[in-house]
Structures are given as C-alpha cells and as structure tokens.
Amino acid sequence: MDEIFVELKKLGAFAAFAWSHAPADNYGVIAIDGQNALRAGDKTAEKVPEGTIDWFTRSPASTVPGEVESLLDRLGASWYLNSVQYESDTGLLHYEWVWQYG
C-alpha cells in the first residue's frame, strides 16, 4: 500500500501537504478510509485497504487526472472515478477516486 503514496509523490503535486486559508491552484490529497475483508471458512482470509485520492485544480486541461488513473492501473489497484465537481466556494475542479490496493 505504501507504493501508492510513493508513486503519487512522484507526480509532484502530492509531494507536500500544507494547510492554508487560500487554496493552491493545484493540490492533491490521499486518504485511507478503511478496508474490505474477504471471509472464508468463517475467518478473514484477506484484507485490502481502501481509500480516496482527491485532486483539486483550476485547470480543466490538467493532465494529473489521467496520470493518477494510469498510475493506479500500473500498480494493479482496483479503482473508480467517484465524482468530478466544481467547488463554487474555491473555484476549483475536484476529482475524487476511490481505490483498493493490497
């Protein structure tokens, strides 16, 4: 699972996280939200971490969404694009992916 964090940091925008009252033009957030478990024979056979990747940008031409999806495919993660929204309070486009990897 750490591989997702390492690879996202290589994209650049995920390299540093800082709190600010004025949002940056482009930034990403990755979170682990929980896990899914496969049960077999009344026991947990496998556990897979699940999380979200959020990308915020002012540019509708941002290449990062495609890079995130290519990265998740390359790592063999299960994922889907959950939503793309315009955040009217910040003026940012917000992409959200849900992923499972393990």
Language-model features, listed with the residues they occupy:
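Small/polar-rich, solvent-exposed N-terminal microdomains that initiate assembly or binding
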Residues: 1-39, 60, 64
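Short, charged interaction patches at domain edges and termini
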Residues: 3-7, 14, 33-48, 82-102
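A common structural junction motif
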Residues: 12-13, 71-79
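Short amphipathic alpha-helical segments, especially helix-boundary/capping motifs
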Residues: 27-29, 41-46, 72-73
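A broad, low-specificity signal marking well-ordered, structured residues that form hydrophobic/aromatic
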Residues: 28, 51, 97
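Short glycine-rich, basic-tinged beta-strand/loop micro-motifs
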Residues: 45-57
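Short beta-strand-to-loop capping motifs
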Residues: 55-59, 99-101
